[in-house]
């Protein structure tokens, strides 16, 4: 019998200039190479969707990308901040809270570590 692969939910990048979401192919490739089954999470989802992700996913990868909104950690937006996505911030902070409550493993890369730092 084949062992069930862990399902890993991956947060998408969001380009606010054209409202595109994307994912670097290296993220799902790395998860698959480690024996996981990667799935891309939608940028916009309800609280019910977040709850369902907790039932479906065994862990979560918070990917790299532009900075989170400095307002979320009590700072003003610096002129050098680019492409701040309120939609991505909203998804990732709700997802982080739910994953922590559910005891799910979380891994952050670059921006993902910023989310963990601010969210915890």
What are these language model-derived features?
Residues 1-109, 117-119:
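N-terminal beta1-alpha1 cap of cysteine-dependent amidohydrolase-like domains
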Residues 113:
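Catalytic nucleophile loop
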């Amino acid at each position: 019998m084949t062992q069930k692969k862990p399902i890993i939910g991956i947060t998408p990048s969001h380009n606010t200039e054209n409202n595109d979401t994307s994912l670097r192919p290296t993220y799902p490739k790395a998860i698959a190479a480690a024996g996981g089954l990667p799935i891309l999470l939608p940028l916009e989802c309800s609280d019910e969707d977040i709850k369902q992700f907790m039932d479906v996913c065994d862990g979560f990868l918070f990917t790299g990308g532009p900075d989170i909104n400095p307002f979320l950690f009590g700072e003003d937006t610096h002129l050098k901040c680019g492409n701040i996505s309120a939609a991505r911030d909203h998804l990732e902070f709700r997802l982080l809270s739910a994953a922590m409550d559910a005891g799910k493993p979380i891994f952050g890369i670059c921006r993902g570590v910023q989310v963990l730092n601010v969210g915890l």
